[in-house]
């Protein structure tokens, strides 16, 4: 149990996808203008990561040498299978949001299908394969990585909403000041890197 707790804390804070590895920055910067939209996208990313990392762990275990047929190693297919599983889960999420939460579906717009190619999603799945997590570890890691990404985007959206009323220099208004805020947040999250779990 302690191992899973340390893996969860590590994936949320120490190895934050957005602020430590800088993965998923396109949607991270583009959707971080309103807290409500950022929260909705964060929940969507938690859903996709929470399901795609363990699902891809199961698929990857079938691709390993001797898993299906003795002497056949299909691990060279891992990238295409990872992308296929992620795309299927995002399509399910998109259909669900369109049917049951149309306001969030419309607010996310083009960024919802872009979760399919969000490098934070693919990065978490690749880290799972590289670190050889078992199924339980992949569930904890997927949920923790998604929660960490959501924490980062909601915090940046809150800062961005407050900065609308600030007196920033004209050249830094908009994306410039957002980059500075994201950089300062990343530096703050670097303080977690010295923690050994």
Curated annotation (Swiss-Prot):
It is found in: Cell inner membrane. It comes from the Bacteria. It catalyses: a ubiquinone + n Na(+)(in) + NADH + H(+) = a ubiquinol + n Na(+)(out) + NAD(+). It is a multi-pass membrane protein. This is Na(+)-translocating NADH-quinone reductase subunit E. HAMAP family: NqrE (MF_00429). Its EC number is 7.2.1.1. It comes from Neisseria gonorrhoeae (strain ATCC 700825 / FA 1090). NQR complex catalyzes the reduction of ubiquinone-1 to ubiquinol by two successive reactions, coupled with the transport of Na(+) ions from the cytoplasm to the periplasm. NqrA to NqrE are probably involved in the second step, the conversion of ubisemiquinone to ubiquinol. Belongs to the NqrDE/RnfAE family.
